[in-house]
């Protein structure tokens, strides 16, 4: 009883010392972590001491203002409009791992948002009407249980990340009245019922998705650069596929005239601006006299030509068709006067000058922007489904940036949707126009179920476009990682087997078409899902067009897909490099882990790792996983010579399929 009597005084003494700041680290270690989190947050976010959070007042922090607990843990913290002024410090509220609702609206908090990734149970986050700044908080993208996100009326800047689609449970998303710029991502949250991005600096066409189509123009207002059918605002005709649609200079236009001096095919000569009227009149008179002289000279040349032609018809002079005079003609020409000999020479020079001018005109005309032809490939030649003008007018949505260029989704005025890849001019400058055309004629003719077909290509003035079919089902990377929780299991192994076979068939087709053809950039982002969710390779055979010696550094995942022999070298990829990348892809399929997180171990150790990543007990589909793991390990050996060919890989996969079918047909299993 004596101990129970003194215990409250003991705690009161401790709390008094903590509130006074004596030995904070020692006493904080004696407090519940949630209480420490609140006090730490108050120390930087409540500079005006509006919150009476003090352990001298009451030890039960669950009764503090705005706090709600469940089983001794804080699950709600609502401090809206309480006059907070300060900054949201890191390692404070992030300790509240049971927090469901966090509301700090209508205060004067400033600075960036700290790392909130530890709030794994957070469902509602209200940070509106403060002075927060910086980029969109990246840690928010990992809060997969989040349903309400409101960060409006702050000073956030930069782009809205496309990874926001990972928050697939969102019902409310309010980003209005910040400083966000760039394009609007293609949001696809099926439960989203409240959405607002008004009052930002967003630009480009608003993606027409089932989610965004639910909202009217009020959700997008005060973004002058936005356009599209959702807000009924026409987009500018300028095509995003070129750095500039008006690059014409005086040297590029025909006959030395600028593009601005052309009007409906007629060349308009601008008047010469002078300061004195007398000089202007003199120029006019001089020009008239010169023109008259040219006319007279032209008439003389015509008469001379007719006379010579008459004499040639009479046998006086007849040149050899090959340009070589016969002996009698040479003797005759030597007896002719210089005037007679000069006439055919003068006439010949005039024709040569005409031909030279025609060639110069044609070469100059080819340098006019947009004068290049849109070249269709394969069976698309006879179809001609669209023109270059239609592509230039198309509304475009940025899909991504790759190692060789930028990819857009283009919606043409006839509602046809295509994918346009604009190649990086700096990286492909080493390839001449003729070499590019020859290569595209070969690659553009490749047709296989597991290849995204190249429909057409275009090049002019250093700009190069490649047009593919559009695949709305997205990439294999999105299927594997996408909006799935990091705790979700990887794809079912039968799906892995089917996808692996599709990819192997596509690679084998490329390799057997020509020994010079390789994919060169195989990874999950370059594999698209077809109409029946078959795997289709894209961006194939483009690495040969780039300058490998000046390649920019890859991200860790892309680098992990590269074979060791080319990872830090300027060597060109080979078919065995594709095989290596295929082995990496199998492990990404089986484990759901990015390529940069794959270990490099012996096959039996790799099987243990795969099984651990899939959270499967030993013996569960063990034989099948073992065969798949062994195939991946063979593809991923360091020595290129020891790697199998894609034909051998296909046989391995078919053996796995046959083993599966035999087990499924066994009546005793």
UniProtKB/Swiss-Prot annotation:
Region ranges (Disordered): 318-365, 547-569
Signal sequence residues: 1-21
Carbohydrate-modified residues: 473, 594
One cellular-component annotation, GO: plasma membrane
Annotated InterPro entries: Kinase-like_dom_sf, Leu-rich_rpt, LRR_dom_sf, PRK1-6/SRF4-like, Prot_kinase_dom
Residues that bear Phosphoserine: 382, 395, 475, 569
Compositional bias of kind Basic and acidic residues: 351-365
Protein name, entry field: Probable inactive receptor kinase At5g67200
């Amino acid at each position: 009883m004596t101990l129970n009597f003194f215990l409250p005084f003991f705690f009161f003494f401790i709390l008094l010392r903590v509130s006074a700041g004596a030995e904070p680290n020692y006493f904080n270690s004696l407090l519940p972590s949630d209480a420490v989190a609140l006090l730490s947050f108050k120390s930087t976010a409540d500079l005006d001491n509006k919150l009476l959070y003090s352990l001298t007042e009451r030890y039960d922090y669950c009764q503090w203002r705005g706090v709600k607990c469940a089983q001794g843990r804080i699950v709600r913290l609502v401090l809206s409009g309480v006059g907070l002024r300060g900054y949201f410090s890191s390692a404070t509220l992030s300790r509240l791992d049971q927090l469901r609702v966090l509301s700090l609206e209508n205060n004067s908090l400033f600075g960036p948002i700290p790392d909130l990734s530890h709030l794994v149970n957070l469902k509602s986050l209200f940070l509106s009407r403060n002075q927060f700044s910086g980029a969109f908080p990246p840690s928010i993208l990992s809060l997969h249980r989040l349903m309400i996100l409101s960060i409006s009326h702050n000073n956030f800047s930069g782009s809205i990340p496309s990874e926001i689609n990972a928050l697939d449970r969102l019902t409310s998303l309010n980003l209005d009245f910040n400083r966000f710029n760039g394009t609007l991502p293609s949001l696809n949250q099926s439960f989203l019922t409240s959405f607002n991005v008004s009052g930002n600096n967003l630009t480009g066409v608003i993606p027409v998705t089932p989610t965004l189509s639910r909202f009217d123009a009020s959700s997008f207002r005060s973004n002058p650069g936005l356009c599209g059918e959702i807000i009924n605002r026409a987009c500018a005709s300028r095509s995003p596929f070129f750095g500039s649609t008006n690059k014409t200079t005086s040297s590029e236009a025909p006959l030395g005239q600028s593009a601005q001096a052309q009007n409906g095919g007629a060349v308009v000569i601008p008047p010469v601006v002078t300061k004195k009227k007398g000089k202007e009149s003199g120029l006019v008179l001089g020009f008239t006299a010169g023109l008259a002289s040219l006319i007279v000279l032209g008439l003389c040349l015509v008469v001379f030509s007719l006379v010579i032609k008459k004499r040639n018809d009479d046998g006086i002079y007849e040149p050899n068709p090959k340009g070589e005079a016969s002996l009698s003609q040479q003797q005759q020409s030597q007896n002719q006067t210089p005037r007679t000999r000069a006439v055919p020479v003068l006439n010949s020079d005039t024709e040569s000058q005409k031909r030279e001018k025609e060639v110069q005109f044609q070469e100059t005309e080819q340098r006019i922007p947009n004068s290049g032809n849109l070249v269709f490939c394969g069976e698309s030649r006879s179809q001609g489904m669209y023109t270059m003008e239609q592509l230039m007018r198309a509304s475009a949505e940025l899909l991504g940036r790759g190692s060789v260029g930028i990819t857009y989704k283009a919606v043409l005025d006839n509602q046809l949707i295509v994918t346009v890849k604009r190649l990086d001019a700096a990286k492909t400058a080493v390839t001449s126009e003729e070499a590019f055309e020859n290569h595209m004629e070969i690659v553009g003719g490749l047709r296989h179920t597991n290849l995204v077909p190249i429909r057409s290509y275009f090049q002019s003035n250093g700009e190069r476009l490649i047009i593919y079919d559009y695949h709305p089902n997205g990439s294999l990377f999105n299927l594997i990682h996408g909006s799935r929780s990091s705790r979700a299991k990887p794809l079912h192994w039968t799906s892995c087997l089917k996808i692996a076979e599709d990819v192997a068939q596509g690679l084998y087709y490329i390799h057997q078409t020509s020994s010079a053809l390789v994919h060169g950039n195989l990874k999950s982002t370059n594999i698209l899902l077809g109409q029946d969710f078959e795997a289709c390779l894209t961006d194939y055979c483009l690495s040969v067009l780039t300058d490998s010696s000046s390649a920019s550094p890859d991200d860790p995942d892309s680098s992990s897909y590269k074979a060791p022999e080319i990872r830090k070298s300027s060597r060109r990829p080979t078919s065995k490099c594709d095989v290596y990348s295929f082995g990496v892809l199998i492990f990404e399929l089986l484990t759901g882990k990015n390529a940069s997180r794959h270990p490099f171990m012996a096959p039996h150790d790799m099987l243990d790792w795969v099984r651990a990543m899939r959270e499967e007990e030993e013996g569960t589909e063990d034989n099948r996983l073992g065969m798949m793991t062994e195939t991946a390990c063979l593809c991923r050996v360091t020595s290129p010579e020891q790697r199998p060919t894609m034909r051998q890989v296909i046989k391995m996969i078919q053996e796995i399929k046959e083993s599966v079918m035999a087990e499924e047909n066994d009546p005793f299993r």
